[in-house]
Amino acid sequence: MSMALAVCSFATPAAAYSLQGDTATDNTGIEPTDGLTAGRPVIHTRGDGVKPPAELGNPSEWGVVKIEINDSAARPLGNTCKEVTHGTWCYGWESAGSNGKKCYSNYLADTGHLTTVRVRNIDYSSGWVPKNKTSYANVTIGLAYTCYAYYNNA
């Protein structure tokens, strides 16, 4: 059975919380976005010393990737899918025509989950999605900005 993750859907804004992401190496109290390299996802597990964003709650596993969107039409690392513990996480950006560029985070998982994208300290969340369904989070804002894409498992 093959499954495909769609790259588009609607997401609603959620409250802004702390930015997240970094290598998990018993670094209690680190700022989670410190040291993120654009296009390189970091996966965390509960108790690894990096606190997830408040919106994610206390997930067993969560991931973050920094996506730098510039005004070029070229899309290095524009769309990527990664196999993670409970499913397939896809993230990246695509053209939204005259509206700018859309940053997205989609996730198909065998457990309850959600996806979120963060731009300018505002979170756009898919909300909780049941197992074996795909979550979709995205935002379209201009031609050049930095976006953080997240997924998490219940």
Where in this protein do the model-derived segments appear?
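Mature secreted bioactive peptide module from preproproteins
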Residues: 68-154
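N-terminal prepro-regions of secreted/extracellular proteins
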Residues: 1-83
